[in-house]
Amino acid sequence: MDEAAGPSTSRTSNLEDVDDEGASLAEEDEEHTKALKAKEMMAPLFQRYNFTMKKNDLPINWNKPEILDKIRSNAVVVLQGATGCGKTTQVPQYLLEEAFERKEYCNIIVTQPRKIAAISIARRVAQERKCDLGTLVGYKVGLKEQHNEDTRLLYVTTGVLLQSLINSKTMATYTHVILDEVHEREVDMDFLLIVVRRLLSTNSKKTKVILMSATIDAKGFSEYFKIPKKSGYLSAPVISVERPRLHVVQEFYFDDLEKLKVDFQIDYEAPGISEQMYNIAAKLVVVCDHLKGQEFGDSLEYKPSIIIFLPGINEIEKMEGALEKLIASIQNAAQRPNLLIMKLHSTLPADDQTAVFRKPGPNQRKVILSTNIAESSITVPDIKFVIDFCLQRILVTDTLTNFSTLRTEWASKSNCIQRAGRAGRLMSGRVYRLVDRRFFENNMDVSTSPEILRCPLETVVLKAKLLEMGTPPSILALAMAPPNLDDIRNTILLLKEVGAMLRTVKGNYDQLDGDLTYLGRIMSKLPLDIRISKLIMLGYIFSVMEEAVTIGAGMNVKNIFLNQNSVKTYSQKMYWADGSGSDAIAILNAYTAWKSRQEQAGDTADMYNWARRMSLDRKSLIDMAELIHEVKDRLNRSGLKPVSGPNRVVWNAREKTVILKVILAGAFYPNYFIPMSVGGKELMERQSFTELGGRDPCNTVFFTGFDHERYIGPLYTVQIKKILSEGDYSKHQAMKVMYDRTTNRIFVTFLGTTDERDQRGSFMPGKVHADVYRAIKLRKLGARNRITEIRTMRQRDAIDYATSAGLGHWEDANGWVPRRKIVRNAHLSVLPPIFREKVVCQVTHVVHPNKFFLRPEDNRNKDIFREIHTQLNARQLHPFPADANFAMGQMVAAPVQENQETYARAVLRSYRNVRTTGSVSWTVFFIDYGHTAAMEETAFRQLDDSLGQLKDIPPRAFEATLTEIQPSAIISPQGSWTTESIHRFKELVLGKIFVAKVYSVVGVVASVELSRDEIRMNSELIRLKYAQYAEESYISKLDHDHRERKQREIMMDENLRNEVYRSAELTQNTYEDDELEDVNPPEDKLRCKVVLSGPHSPLETSASATIRSSVMKPVSIESDSVNSILLDSNPQDTHEKLLVAGGVNEQGNRLVLRQTSVMPNIPGFGAIMSLIFCPTAQLKKDKDETRVVTVLSGLGYDPSTGEALYPEHDMALTLDVVLNDDDITNINALRYTMDSILHTGEGQTDPKFGDASIQKLKLQVKQYIIKILEHERRFLDLRHAPNDYNWRCDLNLTAGSSSSKKMKGDFNIYDKKAIFPLLEPLNLLPVSASQLTFLKKHCHELHKLAHTDVQLPRHGITCQLCNNVLETLPQLRIHLYSKLHRDRESQIKYRSPQMY
């Protein structure tokens, strides 16, 4: 918060000067001297400004004498007056005028709860006094301020005054402190009341305090400021200002609505709205619309409005539905109301909110469905009818878990009265409260519970520490409504967890207190949530502070993205996330783009349209820009700013993405969630294979509920595509729809260019096609709208139409038989056959290391390719006629490269119309090379006459991928290959001859290992740090197992080998033609309807919490998050992934995650982040103490009792990678370096080290984090330690042990002042010789069993090495190929026999 709120210090304007100069005088002359000096200081102001004001007719003026008299004779006065009576603008001016009349010194400060109110009121008062704003009257809110040495009336926000008093610890500089809107009881106001009361009784006894409230109950404030007298305590006087109503507003209650009511009783024990109540409110709207306006003396030219107060957005949607349903049911058009239904809530863009002020059309009535935003923030003047459900939704924080819950409760009477005040401004009106009168009068609370009793207390406790007037509990006990001691204790624990407080006070552990750290002081200065402040400080440590400030500001303001609940806005969110899977990075990218465009275009209509088109809320972005400016200014004043110069830390763009995710994991620890699939990864892969019929789950979704015996699928392909493309026909070419008659499923595979990700596009990290995410989002959004309904033909009509369209034919015995396609010359296919282990190939084209093309270099294939090339280029080819029609899948001759005369075979893939030329451009695929190109139809040549035979020769190149590798998560955080890695791979392989060892062939893609000159390209890319290991998919392992066994059989049986070779030469395949032209049956034939279920994906997952208090709770992600659709983006990888949430809300028993980020696909990332950023950790070993199996992190335990200090937030992460001594050493070095940057000297409040030293430390931070992230870790099977959450089970590993001190040595200099104390050494034991012998023998038996065809026992067998249950022989064989098993074999130094 701002360190000062008053005007700048000046010898002509500050009362402190009077105190100083008069201090040496005799006590009896002091008051006289002060009065003389004050008169001398104020005299120039009295001459420069007008201190008399024209009288107005505001209600407050009737009370002016009483107000001034009470203020003069009392230290504290409570002024109660309804909104609009004039108290905010007039009372401070009364005091100015009185000071002028009495020639006395004055310095008045007035607080407002909101920035906009402080500025607008200051501007209005300056206008009334006819002075320039910033002179006699000024304001100060955040970084915005207008005041000077003349200012005697200063409007500020509550927080500004609070921070000023905390810093100065006196109010003596002010003659009057006016606290306005005290009835709102926000946290800052309640704490300010504590400070004001404390200072009044100590060093500021002469300052007058005025509390102004709009509530009907000011007694509480009066009692709080009791003054001790000889006869007892005297409460502060209360002055009530009455405001006469200009228009009559009648009040009605639920029990007054007899004509509308069904036999229905409200359940007052369960606040909420039932379906009957929605219907009653809808009927009430119709009744109001029929009431004659003349009864109320209306003067408006249009129908006045109705406002309905509802507790939340969900209720607004339901109320809208009830109104629409009722209106549709009214048959008589004359009786049917013409309603303009408008929504009003805080998540709407500012432009949409202002729409409620527009006039309705002729004979139309506006019905506003609003949350409590219309109580005070927004006033619509033309309201006649108020319908109030008397409900509110308040945010309540469970301090034990730190999760917030939006709870629906009955509103208070004061809330309801304020809502009623929306009517009667321009005309008479009516208020309908949908509760019984008796309940309203006798059971509803007078006012809403103060925020301090239900909201987070972190900032309050930090301010209490800065106040230095006692422990946080002792200070907060002085509050008007003291928080529960348990809530204070839990808040202190939370502050210790985030590093704002130490666990000790002057070296001694204290459960209810702790020394404030430098990190905590910075948190107290920033107007942000403490975790966001920590994010910024970690950004400072990791040299990404600029980005951290932007992300933090975006998280703190209202959502900068328009939340329109559509696939379009979801796609835009993906676009802004740029493949990061992070809401935080989406904020950074969106703001950066907006800021850049704003600087170029300014605040223009084009800028407005661009923001809407890109699903951005312009008002929120402007607020975000202001907050960024304010945060940077406060950081600068604290000496924290990005370092410039040659020695600064520099991250490239891709490294920065990873580092931003690292600091997000640090700032929002312990909000860690593990995406999980039911039954584990291996089971999920097997199910994906089964559910999709062997299709790729990364680009395929499916629908169920399609009866293939009744319907002919290809007739409805266009409708299926329409559903998934939301009517965008340009996307139809990129979808392939298939029908499975055995499962009654429809499969849709998304084609397209997901490989080229150099340009920013809408995609997610990992291998899953973005359209799969969009399809699942479509299902979740459209569940209510039945988007998967398709129209079908009657069977007889369908058979006739499909037969005439050439889609197949009908057989009485078999039903519909689809058209089949013959694969000619299949024996000439270049795809490696099952018996071929290695192929000598040339690399003809490279997209990236997981997609390139190979052409076999054996003599036969070379001859075939040469013959094709010769035939196409030895003669003049004929162009197509100008009126030729082309079709997808058609083969033509096309130039291999632009402006060249060399032709090759090409297949037409997709087309688009070129607007500028009016021609058609096709994407063509060169089947003998592997590359694609875009060209116009005029470039095509015919394959006619003798060249027609070329159409029957299979492609001479096949697609391949490097086995068991994927992009490095460090340099490719989006999971896509970088331009640099692709360029290097091309340099290494393009045009060169390699030996390709075939691992598997899935579909038409071969997974291979490329070798040349004893260099294995797969390993080489890992060595160059472009790639990391990747598990092969289940279907790839399945094919690999089949190939290995078949090749072994062939090797052992010469007759079988000859038979296999011979059959390969005779192969002639047919398959169902799935490249049919889309057909669109006539509308009049589509007379039936079928509702499908879907689309579904077998990759859909849920997340699981990791902290102790939440492990059993279901988890969902907020609907506008980029991760609202959570899929297993790398299904072949078996290690656990990590999802970090910026915030967690609780809905019933369910956790809802906000501002989520998918962490990099680095094995063990969650455990590593926990070890880096946790307060302390314990490394739990297995029973033999040979390996670490669990990382237990949290605040630790009480050394005297062994009990956990904060058990609800203890986190136990099971390790699936090997953690060794190098890891702990590097993590400790990083923790120590972070501590050094944040460390303050003894008795100091600023960092101990200077800028030059801190810069060196930041360079060390970069070195350590890169070393930690790049460290390759072997896989481990998941095993749980006994008593995972028990801190007492292994006291040898706890902080402070002798072994710990020995290991830490000289590095333990921070001792109990460390925010990141060093972790303990591993001290692991070697695996015993007997155990090694047993495991090796077990492995030998597994391999031996894999060679057989025996059936496994009923419940399967367990791999003792990996702790995996294997139920079938294929599962066993595939498991033996897994990286987990191979790593475990390597760890016990077992050499497996040659694979079968």
Swiss-Prot record:
Residues 292-468 form the Helicase C-terminal domain. The keyword Hydrolase applies. It catalyses: ATP + H2O = ADP + phosphate + H(+). InterPro entries: DEAD/DEAH_box_helicase_dom, Helicase-assoc_dom, Helicase_ATP-bd, Helicase_C-like, P-loop_NTPase, SNase_OB-fold_sf, Tudor, Znf_C2H2_type. It is an enzyme of class 3 (hydrolase). Keywords: ATP-binding, Cytoplasm, Developmental protein, Differentiation, Helicase, Hydrolase, Meiosis, Nucleotide-binding, RNA-mediated gene silencing, Spermatogenesis. Residues 16-30 have a biased composition (Acidic residues). Its main location: cytoplasm. One of its GO terms (cellular component) is cytoplasm. It is found in: Cytoplasm. Residues 68-234 form the Helicase ATP-binding domain. ATP binds at G81, A82, T83, G84, C85, G86, K87, T88. The keyword ATP-binding applies. This is Probable ATP-dependent RNA helicase spindle-E. It comes from Culex quinquefasciatus. The lineage of its organism: Eukaryota, Metazoa, Ecdysozoa, Arthropoda, Hexapoda. The gene is spn-E.
